[in-house]
Amino acid sequence: MKKRVLSSLVAGVLAIGVLAGCGSNNAEDTTAENNQANASVTETENAGDADNSTVESKGTITVAASATPHAEILEAAKSILADEGWDLQVTVFNDYVQPNEVVESGEFDANYFQHIPYLESFNEEKGTHLVNAGGIHYEPFGIYPGTKTDLADLAEGDVIAVPNDTTNEARALLLLQDNGVIKLKDGVGLEATVNDIEENPYGVEIEELEAAQVSRVAGEVAFVVLNGNYALEAGYSVSKDAIAYETADSEAAKTYVNVIAVKEGNENSEGIQALVQALKSDEIQKFINDTYDGAVIPFTE
């Protein structure tokens, strides 16, 4: 398989977001000690709605979140919770260690930024006791056109660019398998690498690149396989431009659903249950679908 090394430096929240919210299961990829000094924390305004002044107050729910799409979705849910007597307070964190630490310590009730593999890996490495209180959304991988626009036009020697980190590469390879481009060894699942390709009927080459670089070679390769965040950044519309993308019933979607995480024992508390129900409401599902054009999809199970 062909592998191109790119020297471009990648910075910004999106690069980390793919690891924590959209595809990495290695908590070691973030370092608590380094991020404590550099993380910028911005607290959004509390929801204060005069129309809800007659609603009996049930208390405050504090949530640590990443900015996009998590905090945006939470902001949309504030009025729903306010109507039920809950004051939802959202604080945006720019790293992916502190949101777990502040929930573990009890400073915050919940966080919303990560998928289950990252949560489990963080618990194992840091000795925390965080659990999934409810899956809210997933960010699908999609196959996007490069120099070709139809998978049926694939020819021997065509190159398909995929992310090179373990979990994101596995998702890309599984999506290619689901669409008949390759066949993987049985049972490799979300640990698949290019070495697990058992059949390659089109004779394509898989080019492994850092996730943030994949979209940048679209003009040089037949197809690119991208996470939803990177697709948005590159100007793609998931619903309009993706040739194929992960469906809600796919193994990847169920595994990498972004969740509300809480300290063990708090998952059934009244406030957390109200929060999860609000985020899974028809109103919030519509908000997600209308706002993110397929790059973020409500998880309904």
Residue ranges of predicted features:
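Sec-dependent N-terminal signal peptides of Gram-positive bacterial secreted proteins and lipoproteins
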Residues: M1-N26
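Bacterial lipoprotein signal-peptidase II cleavage site
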Residues: V18-A50
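Short, polar/charged alpha-helical segment
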Residues: E45, A67-Q89
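Short, well-ordered beta-strand elements
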Residues: E56-T68, W86-V92, D158-I160
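A bilobed periplasmic-binding-protein/Venus flytrap-type ligand-binding module shared by bacterial periplasmic
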Residues: P140-L151, Y256-S269
